[in-house]
Swiss-Prot record:
Residues that coordinate or bind spermidine: H66, D90, D160, S161, T162, D163
Sorted UniProt keywords: Cytoplasm, Polyamine biosynthesis, Spermidine biosynthesis, Transferase
A molecular-function term among this protein's GO annotations: spermidine synthase activity
Chain's gene name: speE
Species for this entry: Xylella fastidiosa (strain 9a5c)
Protein known as: Polyamine aminopropyltransferase
Metabolic or biological pathway: Amine and polyamine biosynthesis; spermidine biosynthesis; spermidine from putrescine: step 1/1
Amino acid sequence: MTTNDSWFTEHFQATGSAIGFRITGKLDEVQSPFQKIEIYNSTDWGKLMVIDGALMLTSRDNFLYHEMISHPALFTHTAPKCVVIIGGGDCGTLREVLKHPDIEQVTQCDIDEQVTRMAEKHFPELCTSNNDPRATLLFSDGVAYMTDCPTNSVDVIIVDSTDPVGPAKGLFNRTFYESCFRALKNDGLLVQQSESPLALLELIKEMRHEMSKAGFKAFKTLPFPQPCYPTGWWSVTLSSKQPNANFAFRQTDAQTKPFDTLYYNAHLHHGVLVPPPFIAHALGE
């Protein structure tokens, strides 16, 4: 990461690329026990949240990520009631999950309370569901939370984490996935952000391999645009305990959903289930 008087620039060694945003200044900064969190104001992308030099979200395009990590999984499950979010400290995913009126309980566990406090201060539009009576916000280790989570108690687990480094490294291995597998009901789903399908397919393959070793039987990776992330293209990966899962979704419910979205709809969901040939070939679909 580099900054000067007018630009925030993030360099991506893994992809040999960089991305920049014209800024008007730094609005806030806090050093938590886990990471440094910075907020910048930009000329065209609203506010930026940066953690340890890596851009996490912008006001302008965060809806893409938050909608795609939430709604496909929730409309794929037949009747989700209980959801766990690991990570998700900016609370945008929590907001999207709680748009579903039949959800009864959501527990969000993020290791760093300061991410949520900074989001409440600078991205209040993401935090409109923080006081929903169905929501419980915990600030502790997500790996430990899943280790202690009761068996067969959760319908959907959403792993809304940073990249697999630092505090999030433990969310990308077999041990963590075994805890998720045990906590999910038989028809439960795990969905996790899975990086860029254009540049990091090997990481997605490794994630699926670790999930498979933990017991998951079927997988589907859904790509979507994300301009502020490396390559401008991102993905989430759904995992099922059922060997014959085809990830068909409740299309009528998605078409008649009683809430607004900016990116997700039933037609898009249907299309994203068909991967581009290079992804299908690499992932054996």
